Every structure is written in structure tokens, then in C-alpha cells.
UniProtKB/Swiss-Prot annotation:
This enzyme's EC code(s): 6.1.1.15
SUPFAM superfamilies, per the entry: Class II aaRS ABD-related, Class II aaRS and biotin synthetases, YbaK/ProRS associated domain
Protein name in the entry: Proline--tRNA ligase
GO MF entries: aminoacyl-tRNA deacylase activity; ATP binding; proline-tRNA ligase activity
Length: 579
């Protein structure tokens, strides 16, 4: 590809509205342009990277035995009503009507569509297992699209769906897909972790997320310092504390605290350890509990884990914090003055709360707190459950080592769905015993467009992107110095361009009339791993300058013209086929 026949579209200035490095570099490198909030046009350089990731994903899906299909992004609402996700999915589901006022959705996922297909095409257990995949555009009407393509409304995704007649068959395919995902991310040279995860709105019994480690990641992932344990923070269990509850040392007393509306203010004004404070969070109770509100208790230095709290049968789903109006109507005080003593509603306390003694909490009266509260002396122990996020240094749930917490970008998610969708939509086959049985499903997603941003978040420097070789937009850049002024430079550049291209290499030939500094800066910005610089002075010695710009190494050296092709072939093959 010649730059004079290509849309390079690089930018010198840092885009004002780009918050994270991948968004900045994708705009500056001419990979994407914003059309509207959360909607992006992919320019040629971005498209080349996207297609290379697609090819890796497609190759590994084919090796895993998945069959490629293409399903429509526009889906009839009656399928979503049948699965009951029409009511439960939320505002991210874009709903609209056609000219005949028939309701449709713009698909964020395709469980309903594939289940409808399979229930009409598959009738016997003998036709199972089957695993279908597609690489297709999705749409989620995000309330606040941000970070460029990282959280866009329209995005490219690989989604796969498997169908089985036994749990053993599902587990076998699940493991095959787990290994395929691992291979995909290894081929892309990403530093990632596969972590246990919550099934969320997709549903099912078991799931794993594949998280690319990056400081800009929106997710927190937890892993052991010793073992292979790894989980999303939403799922990581906070174990029952080893220590026993200490005996009371303080008397119960109530103190005026007019300027202590938060835990931090209470700690600062009364010089008490934050571990001796209690947060009382009021949420709406499940409609079958007989109560409107209930209280969740966590230690002052801990954060409530909404996913864990939602699993309590007494909590309304989704978990919703009570309005200040409802809190005041039921308790007589507002947030900042709440506590468990004399609270007339169900109470659920975190495990760490159960071993607290001589602690402080709101009195349920404005601007007053109790100090010296003790369980069983001043109030009975409530229901005890795991309600909090783990913190670094907590013991690992598998009993091996302690926990570290890193930020991650979710790029893949696999689920064992079970019969959630087949049950709702009547997807049955005739079993070995001759009776009808529900098909058992698995679901496997990869954010293809998000992978582009995730790779940049991990691999960049002050000059631009450092692409892993397998997904670089071009493998080789040819930079002739003063192309229009030197016949020798032009002839050698043309010869090398033709020869390298004939060998199947992705080559960009910068034939613009630009200063060398501009050419160097553009190639570094868009992240070309191998650069050949051809100038008159080097040609006099039958040489050229070679620069390597990889994710783990940068170097430059002189090469004999006669050695260039064999040198590049060896370098590129070594990166694609590491020992």
C-alpha cells in the first residue's frame, strides 16, 4: 500500500475529549472518527487491525469446532418477550417499531435468535452437540458512552452458542472454548487473566471473564499471590474472619455529632479507627418479604458488593437504595445518622461486622451517633452474609495465599447457560429414552472491537502504538529519504516494495513528499513494527537502516541490501512462531 493511495489521517494534536490513551491514540493514528455519541467510523488503518483480530478469532473458532453463521441485528420483540428479557434487560435494549407498528429490538446479544433457529432445525439428541458462532455488529444504548470504542453503543462482537443434550457435553465444549479463548489472547500477546465471574443479565450457572490487565480498566479483578485462584471482584468471596469477637470494653453512649455526616468525618472528628465504624445502607426489600425496606451493614472501611447483596432472598432485584424520602418516613432520620440499634426492619450484616465490638454507628436520630456498641449486649446478632468487596491482603477464598487486586478490561466472557433460554422458548429434542428434553446451552462472547483498544492500553509509548505483530495494520514500512530527488533511492524502494509484497508481507510504502521527521513520526504513531529507511548515503555502502519497534524491544541497525528480505522473513516468522 502506497501512502499516496491511502487515507493515513494522522493527527498531531491530542484530541480534547479523549480520556484514555487508547482513545487518544486511535484518533491520532487515524484509526477511527466519531460520528455521534458512542458511534464511530473505522478508517482504513483501524479496519486493518480489526480484520486481523477477526481472522485470529475465526481461525481459533474453526479449530474449536464452531460453525460460522450470520444472524440479523434487528430482532422481533416477540422473541425477547418469550425469553422474558423484554421486561428485564433494561434501557440498554434499543426498542423500536417498523412502519406496521410491529415492535423490534436492535440486538445487544443473540441468545433468542439462535435458540429460535435451533428449536426449528434440530429435533434429535443425535444432532447434538452443535456450536454456532458469528462475528456481528451489536448495539447497546449505553447511558454514558465513554473511552472511545471501549464503551461504545455500537460494537463488533464474536458470539457463539452451543447446544447439548447432557451437562457433560456442555462442560466439554465449555472447556474447549476456554482453551480457544486462551489461545486467541496469547496469539495477540496480551497480558490477561481468566477469572470466575457473575452471570449477570445473560444468566446461567457458571461463567468466566477474560480480563486484559490495564490501569484504565473499569473492572476490578482479584487473584491469589500463591494459587491459580482468580475472580471478578463481584464474585470473590470474603471469608469468615479468623478472629473472634472481642469482649465489650466500653459502655454504650450517645454523642452529638452535628458535623459528622460521613464515616470519614466521624473518624476525623472523634479520632477513632475506621475499622470501628459501621455503615448502614437502606435498600428496598423483596416484595415477598413482608417489608418495604431492609438494612445492610458493612464495616466503615468496606464497600457493599451489590451482586452479593442481590443474592439474598430478602433483597429486591435489582438492588436499589432507598430514597431519602422513604428513609426519613420509616426511620425519622436521614443518611448519615443511621444505625442498627432500635431499627424496626430486617437487618443483614456482613461477616466482618459480626466480629466487631465497641463500634460506632448512627443512632437513627439526626446528628447523633452511638459509641461503644456491642453485639448480644446491646442488640442481637442479625442475619450474617457475605456482603462486601474483598480488599487486598484478604485471605484467598481457596485458602492459599492472600489477594491482590488489579484493574482489567473485559474482552471475553463465557457462560454455562443450562436451560434458561431453551426452557423459556421451548427448545427441545428427543432424548435417548425417546422422551422430549430441553436442550442445554452454552454462550461465549468476545469483544472484537474492544480488543483493539485493550491491546493499545497495554502496548504503547510516548511516540505511539506498539502493536503485537499479529495485529499490526502493516508489518513493514518503507521510508525513502528524498524519494523525488534520488533515482537510486526511488529504484531501491520500489524494488523492495515489490519483492516484499510478492512474499505476502503487509507493506506500507511512504511515497509522500514529506520531511523525514514527519514520516518517522507517522509510522511510530500508527505502530509499524519493522521500518526500512532508504537514503543515498547508506546506499553508497549497499546498506539501509532498519528499525524495530515491538512491544518488548526497540532497536535500530544497519543491514546489507542483499540481506534485507531474508532478515525480515526470519524476524517476522520468529514473532508469529515463537519457540
Amino acid at each position: 500500500m502506497r501512502t499516496t493511495q491511502y487515507l493515513l489521517s494522522t493527527l498531531k494534536e491530542l484530541p480534547a475529549d479523549a480520556e484514555i490513551i487508547s482513545h487518544q491514540l486511535m484518533l491520532r493514528a487515524g484509526m477511527i472518527r466519531k460520528l455521534a455519541s458512542g458511534l464511530y467510523t473505522w478508517l482504513p488503518t483501524g479496519t486493518r487491525v480489526l480484520k486481523k483480530i477477526e481472522n485470529i478469532v475465526r481461525e481459533e473458532m474453526n479449530k474449536a469446532g464452531a460453525i460460522e453463521v450470520v444472524m440479523p441485528i434487528v430482532q422481533p420483540a416477540d422473541l425477547w418477550q418469550e425469553s422474558e428479557r423484554w421486561e428485564h434487560y433494561g434501557p440498554e435494549l434499543l426498542r423500536f417499531a417498523d412502519r406496521s407498528e410491529r415492535p423490534f429490538v436492535l440486538g445487544p446479544t443473540h441468545e433468542e435468535v439462535i435458540t429460535d433457529l435451533v428449536r426449528n432445525e434440530i429435533s434429535s439428541y443425535k444432532q447434538l452437540p452443535l456450536n454456532f458462532f458469528q462475528i456481528q455488529t451489536k448495539f447497546r444504548d449505553e447511558i454514558r458512552p465513554r473511552f472511545g470504542i471501549m464503551r461504545a453503543r455500537e460494537f463488533l462482537m464474536k458470539d457463539a452458542y452451543s447446544f447439548h443434550n447432557t451437562l457433560e457435553s456442555l462442560q466439554e465444549t465449555y472447556q474447549t472454548m476456554y482453551q480457544a479463548y486462551t489461545k486467541i489472547f496469547e496469539r495477540m500477546q496480551l497480558n490477561f487473566r481468566a477469572v470466575q465471574a457473575d452471570t449477570g443479565s445473560i444468566g446461567g450457572s457458571r461463567s468466566h471473564e477474560f480480563q486484559v490487565l490495564a490501569d484504565s480498566g473499569e473492572d476490578e479483578i482479584v487473584f491469589s499471590t500463591v494459587s491459580d485462584f482468580a475472580a471478578n471482584i463481584e464474585l470473590a468471596e470474603a471469608l469468615v474472619p479468623h478472629e473472634k469477637r472481642a469482649s465489650p470494653c466500653e459502655t454504650l453512649r450517645i454523642i452529638d455529632t452535628p458535623n459528622a455526616k460521613t464515616i470519614d468525618q466521624l473518624v476525623e472528628q472523634f479520632s477513632i479507627p475506621i475499622e470501628k465504624t459501621l455503615k448502614t445502607l437502606i435498600v428496598y426489600a423483596h416484595k415477598d418479604s413482608g417489608h418495604k425496606l431492609l438494612a445492610l451493614l458493612v464495616r466503615g472501611d468496606h464497600l457493599i458488593n451489590k451482586v452479593k447483596a442481590e443474592k439474598s432472598p430478602q433483597v429486591a432485584k435489582p438492588l436499589t437504595f432507598a430514597s431519602e424520602e422513604d428513609i426519613r418516613a420509616h426511620i425519622g432520620a436521614g443518611p448519615g445518622s443511621l444505625g442498627p440499634l432500635h431499627l424496626k426492619m430486617p437487618i443483614i450484616a456482613d461477616r466482618a461486622v459480626a466480629v466487631m465490638s465497641d463500634f460506632s454507628a448512627g443512632s437513627n436520630k439526626e446528628d447523633q451517633h452511638y459509641f461503644g456498641i456491642n453485639w448480644e449486649r446491646d442488640l442481637p446478632l442479625p442475619i450474617i452474609e457475605d456482603l462486601r468487596n474483598v480488599v487486598e491482603g484478604d485471605p484467598s477464598p481457596d485458602g492459599k495465599g492472600t489477594l491482590l487486586i488489579k484493574r482489567g478490561i473485559e474482552v471475553g466472557h463465557i457462560f454455562q447457560l443450562g436451560t434458561k433460554y431453551s426452557q423459556a422458548m421451548g427448545a427441545k429434542v428427543q432424548g435417548e429414552n425417546g422422551r422430549q428434553q430441553m436442550m442445554i446451552m452454552g454462550c461465549y462472547g468476545i469483544g472484537v472491537s474492544r480488543l483493539v483498544a485493550a491491546a493499545i492500553e497495554q502496548h504503547h509509548d510516548q511516540h505511539g502504538i506498539l502493536w503485537p505483530e499479529a495485529i499490526a495494520p502493516f508489518q513493514v514500512a518503507i521510508l525513502p529519504i528524498h524519494l523525488k530527488k534520488s533515482d537510486a533511492v526511488r529504484q531501491e524502494a520500489e524494488r523492495l516494495y515489490a519483492e516484499l509484497s510478492s512474499l505476502g508481507m503487509d507493506v506500507i510504502f511512504d511515497d509522500r513528499q514529506e520531511r523525514p521527521g514527519v514520516m518517522f513520526a507517522d509510522m511510530e504513531l500508527i505502530g509499524i513494527p519493522h521500518t526500512l529507511i532508504i537514503g543515498d548515503r547508506d546506499l553508497e555502502n549497499n546498506e539501509l537502516e532498519y528499525r524495530y519497534r515491538g512491544i518488548d524491544d526497540h532497536k535500530k541497525q544497519q543491514l546489507k541490501i542483499s540481506d534485507v528480505v531474508s532478515f525480515l522473513l526470519e524476524k517476522i516468522n520468529s514473532h508469529f512462531n515463537p519457540k
